[in-house]
């Protein structure tokens, strides 16, 4: 773990992880860091912007002691945060279906290495700062239909847009993300077999209606009233967390504040439709 130690020293985070904690640290191997540097075009750790490196390291740290037996498939908060805002911790998607997979990109290879102030799990890849696409792709049990819609061949290049880094327009994003069940209900409502049977123009307008550009609106910051999306305007009742589309159809926010580095996702139980 010499590379991890060097990274902590460069970012002045060594003292943080030597404090009382307790912490759960997902620790990348030297090979994992080498792969990370190569994939991102860096010749050395020193070439990585210090703020990016610090955020990336904090994205591997979770408060409290989480032994392998305590980890379940769910979202947890890391010690990294959106735009360095302490009230907007970055999420991590833990999938324990087969072993322990983090954000769909890094697997625990050795678990439960005891430390004086917590526990360490060794991982085989650096957990890069997540985008809203990271979570949609990693959480296939919830969002695979949404990803299928976003990546349909006749659609705009949504994945490129939605991976735009914070600080570069049109990021950040607030995404109201329909679940797989929401899409199943939509297909029944429209009388179609699946996403491939939805008209291309309608699909584009529909997807656009689920995205607010230029704002990271967490659940606690939602206000009642009309909100402008990339598509049609929506009406939000912040008290009940119900969203009404232009057709009077309603959707309930069922999971809030899945926080990425370039925006936030709120899962909803009904697909919102543009004015039909």
Residue ranges and their predicted role:
Residues 1-276:
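Mature, structured domains of secreted/extracytosolic soluble proteins
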